[in-house]
Curated annotation (Swiss-Prot):
The protein's name: Dual-specificity RNA methyltransferase RlmN
GO terms classed as biological process: rRNA base methylation; tRNA methylation
Localization in the cell: Cytoplasm
GO molecular function: 4 iron, 4 sulfur cluster binding; metal ion binding; rRNA (adenine(2503)-C2-)-methyltransferase activity; rRNA binding; tRNA (adenine(37)-C2)-methyltransferase activity; tRNA binding
EC number(s) stated in the UniProt entry for this protein: 2.1.1.192
Region (Disordered) location: 1-24
Length: 414
């Protein structure tokens, strides 16, 4: 990853130090309770002999300490009996995923490279990236739902990494736990300081967006369970209006998401004609634009108060003409919508360039005059490859040639 003193800092958290190699006779790590929902916490208690009417109370206690207080040790749970704390510590842990790398951008954006254990002995562990984007009035955490991605969107860096597997609900929730740990975003913790952090309100992580690595609707069951845990008012307490699921257009799951879960919806659109979208977002060949837009018009959770966000990356000479803007306006008729125009963020090896600002502003003005909010998303975290479309979980740093190429691309956009 590119890092220069004036643009970014790179830090490895104390708990992120590489674990020593385990010998053949070394005990396996204890299973962690982090990220589990109430049913799974109940099952964990049942396994150590906590049953009957007592179990529900104990689940509520664990929920409070894990998700509201951010406990990292069972010893912190002072209203839980010493005997039960000992039993819990003997069978389980409160371990978070390993932080392999933490980077802080010059604009305050933070990116964590997180490592989950291998699924089977002898296999490689799984690395994913999570990004925190602070603003004065909010802090948005961009979480991943898959290790890699299968969509192969031509403008997206994640699409160059093969899909390994879906993340579990616990692994999705654990990303939020890590971010709140590192930011001190729990009662009684020392809050993080630095450029760009929210100055309003009492929370640093206020919003969650499923816009990291992977297609969330291909990991539907995990995403649904994770949202229920994240939105529980007795714990992390992130209301569903503060949780956005972004999809490239898995049409059959869009209605299901609205009916069963009801978060905010974002669509990675990026083109208004099937021929171009087939190239940019290949899933369009399976679910073309007409089918996608019909799913949006009937999305159960959509309303004027809960508009669907359409994401549109601005690619120089590809999809940024005034005719494209007018076609976008026509396409959105009948949909409660807003449009996020995203300046393309460069990454090594890409064939695309970002539209110039005059072109972006002209495009935005056409959409705005038609009655749609059309903010231009300010690029955040470009210097640490944390911006939209730049995530990729490989832990190896960029080669010198790739760093020079990236610097050149960024310089051209300034």
């Amino acid at each position: 990853m590119m890092s220069t003193p004036e643009t970014a800092t790179e830090a490895t958290a104390p708990e992120a130090a590489p674990a020593p190699s385990l010998g053949a006779d070394a005990p396996a790590p204890l299973p962690s309770l982090i990220g589990l929902d109430r049913d799974k916490l109940g099952a964990a208690l049942d396994a150590i002999g906590v049953r009957g009417s007592d179990r529900r109370m104990r689940v509520n206690q664990l929920w409070h300490w894990i998700y509201l207080r951010g406990a990292t040790d069972f010893a912190e749970m002072t209203n839980v009996s010493k005997h039960l704390r000992a039993d819990l510590a003997a069978a389980y842990s409160l371990a978070r995923p390993e932080i392999v790398m933490e980077q802080v951008s010059q604009d305050g954006t933070r990116k964590w490279l997180l490592r989950f254990p291998a699924d089977h002995p002898g296999e490689r562990p799984h690395d994913i990236e999570t990004v925190y984007i602070p603003e004065s009035d909010r802090g948005t955490l961009c979480v991943s739902s898959q290790v890699g991605c299968t969509l192969n969107c031509s403008f997206c860096h994640t699409g160059t990494q093969r899909l390994v597997r879906n993340l579990t609900a616990a692994e999705i929730v654990a990303q939020v736990m890590v971010a709140r740990d590192r930011l001190g975003d729990y009662p009684g913790r020392d809050r993080a300081t630095g450029p760009g952090l929210p100055t309003e309100g009492d929370r640093l992580v206020t919003n969650i967006v499923f816009m990291g690595m992977g297609e969330p609707l291909y990991a539907y069951d995990s995403v649904k369970e994770a949202i229920e845990t994240l939105s529980d008012g007795d714990g992390l307490g992130l209301g569903k209006r503060r949780i956005t699921v972004s999809t490239s257009g898995v049409v059959p799951e869009i209605e299901r998401l609205g009916a069963e879960v009801g978060p905010m919806l974002a669509i990675s659109l990026h083109a208004v004609r099937d021929k171009l979208r087939d190239e940019l977002v290949p899933i369009n060949k399976k679910y073309p634009i007409a089918e996608l837009m019909e799913a949006c018009r009937t999305y159960p959770a959509a309303s004027n108060a809960k508009r669907i966000t359409f994401e549109y990356v601005m690619l120089k000479g590809v999809n940024d003409s005034p005719a494209d803007a007018r076609a976008l306006v026509k396409l959105l008729e009948g949909v409660p919508a807003k449009i996020n125009l995203i300046p393309f963020n460069p990454w090594p090896g890409t064939q695309y360039e970002c539209s110039d600002w005059e072109t972006i502003e002209r495009f935005s003005d056409i959409v705005f005059r038609a009655g749609y909010a059309s903010p231009v998303r300010t690029p955040r975290g470009r210097d640490i490859l944390a911006a939209c479309g730049q995530l990729k979980s490989e832990s190896e740093k960029l080669s010198a040639r790739e760093r020079l190429a990236l610097r050149a691309m960024m310089a051209q956009d300034e």
